[in-house]
């Protein structure tokens, strides 16, 4: 039925923020059948439940009153087409492990997304992205299962409503559904996705997928905190997307502000730049702080609780709103005793 079942166990090692909260039960599942059986038990008994992968994009606000289901449904199926490789990847696979696997197999195209924490399922839900590439660029379909009747629904890329760090799986296919697999299309005719840090590399003229993978890993290791030492959920805030009018207003005071024009005409501003320009110095709430090497990341120095992190996040939001007129939207999901909630 499931690999492990724990009662009133700490979730500290199951969320990358390392928040020391508990759940009524923690259950690791390895099959779809196990997942459905547990869901039915929770549903019949009116017990709250939540499905997690690697716990890399969540902040637990308090002890969870229900069952935390840890998705360990794994497996990769490969289908060869004339021009592409099609990978059917189950949602419990670790994303970075998938990237390494494709490189070993000689399938190139995922290397820009190396070292992103989390599972394949959460990659689709979140539409992960980095260094010029997003999940939506390589996704063929996403399979979700109705936990009520066991029917699998395949959503092709166009119907997934992928957008900046979001998808249809964050709202419509949320309660009563679970992402079980992601279809990924990798072109045989590989072309590198070039990004600014890559252009600065001396090896740009002899670039290949393996070198891009190594460069991305080096960059991320250099600027991102070690999860084993400093709890965090990666980028705490989304990069704000604002109007050209507001962008021009800010540029009149900050001529060197970086910005990126979107296809719809709106402008994306790096949230890390906004936070850095405010100059919060060494602000710290309890054991919650801003990571010095990447201002977009809030860290748990040792024993921070959710209140510390939330208070720090609120201070940042208020200050950035006052100085730039920009609201920083959280990227992490907040979970209270009954499930996901909207905060900040």
Curated annotation (Swiss-Prot):
Reactions mediated catalytically: UDP-N-acetyl-alpha-D-muramate + NADP(+) = UDP-N-acetyl-3-O-(1-carboxyvinyl)-alpha-D-glucosamine + NADPH + H(+)
Record's keyword terms, sorted: Cell cycle, Cell division, Cell shape, Cell wall biogenesis/degradation, Cytoplasm, FAD, Flavoprotein, NADP, Oxidoreductase, Peptidoglycan synthesis
Disulfide linkage: none
GO biological process, one term: peptidoglycan biosynthetic process
Active site: 165, 235, 331
Location(s) in or outside the cell: Cytoplasm
TM region(s), chain numbering: none
Cofactor(s) in the UniProt record: FAD
Pathway entry: Cell wall biogenesis; peptidoglycan biosynthesis
Domain FAD-binding PCMH-type: 19-189
InterPro entries given in the database record: FAD-bd_PCMH, FAD-bd_PCMH-like_sf, FAD-bd_PCMH_sub1, FAD-bd_PCMH_sub2, MurB, MurB_C, MurB_C_sf, Oxid_FAD_bind_N
Keyword Oxidoreductase (UniProt): yes
EC number from the UniProt entry: 1.3.1.98
Membership in a protein family: Belongs to the MurB family.
Function, as annotated: Cell wall formation.
Entries under PANTHER family matching the protein: UDP-N-ACETYLENOLPYRUVOYLGLUCOSAMINE REDUCTASE
The protein's name in its UniProt record: UDP-N-acetylenolpyruvoylglucosamine reductase
Name of the encoding gene: murB
